[in-house]
Amino acid sequence: MVNIRPDEISSIIRKQIEQYNQEVKVVNIGTVLQVGDGIARIYGLDKVMAGELLEFEDGTVGIALNLESDNVGAVLMGDGLNIQEGSSVKATGKIAQIPVSDGYLGRVVNALGRPIDGKGDIPASEYRLIESPAPGIISRRSVYEPMQTGLIAIDAMIPIGRGQRELIIGDRQTGKTAVATDTILNQKGQNVICVYVAIGQKASSIAQVLNTFEERGAMDYTIIVAETADAPATLQYLAPYTGAAIAEYFMYRGKHTLVIYDDLSKQAQAYRQMSLLLRRPPGREAYPGDVFYLHSRLLERAAKLSSQLGEGSMTALPIVETQAGDVSAYIPTNVISITDGQIFLSADLFNAGIRPAINVGISVSRVGSAAQIKAMKQVAGKLKLELAQFAELEAFSQFASDLDKATQNQLARGQRLRELLKQSQAAPLAVEEQVATIYTGVNGYLDVIEVAQVRRFLTELRQYLGTNKPKFGEIIREKKAVTEEAESLLKAAIKEHTEAFLLQEESVGSRS
C-alpha cells in the first residue's frame, strides 16, 4: 500500500481553496417546441433581444427574429437536423458579427466570414457587426470621383462614381454578372478593394467567376463571399450584409471599395421563405411588408465618406433579375427607387449580338457627369445624343421607302456608333483607350469604314496609338483632359491608321 503523506494532501487542498472562484452566471435558457424548415419555435427566453444569436444543444446557431407573447421564432444557420423538440436553447447575449482583417484579400468566405476555399484559417484583427448603421448625412460628401468600369457604354453614358449605388437589372442570361466582373477586372492597379457577393448561385458559376479572377490576377484585391443555392435561407439572407461589413472595414480605413451583390432577387426570395415560415403576414407577391427595408438598409451603407472620416468610399453594384423584362415588378421597383440609377440589360439586344446588351434609352445614372473626367465629358456628350436620334430614326426608317441623304448619313453614323460600343467579355478598356475610341466615332472618322470592319479597325487603332503615340495616353492620364496636343496626336494616329487599314482592305479585296 502506498504511503499517503498528510502534508501533501493538505497542500493540494490549500491550492484548490486558493484557486476556487465563486462565479455566478445567469443564463437565459429556453426549450424547443417545434423545429423544421430552418425555423425553430422556442418557449422561454423571456429576456431575448430581436436579432440576438441563440445556441442550440447540438452547437447550431440561430437568430431570434419573431418575439411573440408565448414563444420566440428563430431562424437557423444550419440544417438543424440534430435539434430535437424539448432540447434546451441558450441566449448568447450577442448579435451576428464577423471577424475582419486585411488577410481576407484573395479569399473565398461564407456568410459567417469563415473560409471555404481550403486555404486555412484567416487571422482576424477585429470583429464587425454584420448589420451596422449606415453613415449619416454629415459623414458623407457628394460623389465626384469616377469608378471606371472599362465598358465604353457605361463610362461614357451612364457613368458611375465612387460611393454611388448603381443597379444592374435584366432578364436571366443577359450578361449582368459579366458587366459586374468586368468592372472588378478593370480595378487592377486602381487601389480599389472589391467584394463579390454570390447569393444563391450554382457552385459551378461561382467557381467560373473565381477562375476568371485568378487568371487575370484580380484575386489580389478581391474577396468573394459565397452562399450557394443549397445553403440555408438564413445564410443567403445574411451574405450581402457580410459583404458590406467586410467592405466597411476597408472603407473606414480610407480605402476605396466596390461591392457587387449578385443578386438581390435571390436574397429577397430567401427572406420571403424565412418570413412565411415564421408566419409573418405576406404582402405583394407574397413578400413580407419590410422587404423594402431589407434592401434599403443594405444599400444605404454605400457612401463616399467626408474628409474627417478619411475620404474612403463604398460603391455598390446590386444585381436584380427581371422576368420577361418586367421592370415594374415589386423587387425591381424597390431597388430602382433606392439606387442612384440603373443599367438595364435587354435580352433582345443580347440576342441581336449587341454585347454588353445595355439599353441606353432606359439606363440612367443620377450622378451623371460629376463622375467623369474632363476628357470623357469632352467626347461623350455627343455620343448619347447621336445614339438617341439614331434609335428614333431607325424605327422611323423601317416604314419610309426613300430617305434623303442627310438621314442616310445619320443612320450610317448610328450603326457605326453602335458597333463602337460592342466589347468582348473580360476585355475592359483603359480610359484613354475609351476616349480615343469615342472621339473617332463621334467625329465621323468611322464613316469611311465598313460597318462589319469597325470593331477590328478600332482594336488595331488602339494598339497603334499605344505603340506609336504613347504620349496621348500619358496626357489623358495626367491632365485628365483632351488637350490640343493630345487631339493633334490622336488625329494624326487616326489619319495614318485609316490610310494603312483602307490600303490593306483594298489589297485583300483585289486578291479575292
UniProtKB/Swiss-Prot annotation:
**Which is one Gene Ontology cellular component term of this protein?**
proton-transporting ATP synthase complex
Its name, as the record gives it, is: ATP synthase subunit alpha, chloroplastic
Note the SS bond partners: none
Residues annotated for ATP binding in this entry: G170, D171, R172, Q173, T174, G175, K176, T177
The cross-references to PROSITE patterns, in alphabetical order and at most eight, read:
ATPASE_ALPHA_BETA (PS00152)
Q: What class of enzyme is it?
A: translocase
Q: What does this protein do?
A: Produces ATP from ADP in the presence of a proton gradient across the membrane. The alpha chain is a regulatory subunit.
Which gene carries the instructions for this protein?
atpA
List the EC numbers from the record. 7.1.2.2
Q: Tell me, what is one Gene Ontology molecular-function annotation carried by this entry?
A: proton-transporting ATP synthase activity, rotational mechanism
Q: How does it sit in the membrane?
A: Peripheral membrane protein
InterPro entries linked to this entry: ATP_synth_asu-like_sf, ATP_synth_asu_C, ATP_synth_asu_C_sf, ATP_synth_F1_a_nt-bd_dom, ATP_synth_F1_asu, ATPase_a/bsu_AS, ATPase_F1/V1/A1_a/bsu_N, ATPase_F1/V1/A1_a/bsu_N_sf
Q: Where is this site: Required for activity?
A: S363
Give the primary localization class.
plastid
- PANTHER family in UniProt: ATP SYNTHASE SUBUNIT ALPHA, MITOCHONDRIAL
Family listed: Belongs to the ATPase alpha/beta chains family.
- What's its catalytic activity? ATP + H2O + 4 H(+)(in) = ADP + phosphate + 5 H(+)(out)
Q: Where in or outside the cell is it found? A: Plastid, Chloroplast thylakoid membrane
> Entry's SUPFAM superfamilies?
C-terminal domain of alpha and beta subunits of F1 ATP synthase, N-terminal domain of alpha and beta subunits of F1 ATP synthase, P-loop containing nucleoside triphosphate hydrolases
UniProt keyword terms in alphabetical order: ATP synthesis, ATP-binding, CF(1), Chloroplast, Hydrogen ion transport, Ion transport, Membrane, Nucleotide-binding, Plastid, Thylakoid, Translocase, Transport
Question: Quaternary arrangement and interactors, per the entry?
Answer: F-type ATPases have 2 components, CF(1) - the catalytic core - and CF(0) - the membrane proton channel. CF(1) has five subunits: alpha(3), beta(3), gamma(1), delta(1), epsilon(1). CF(0) has four main subunits: a, b, b' and c.
Query: Which Pfam family is one of this chain's hits?
Result: ATP-synt_ab
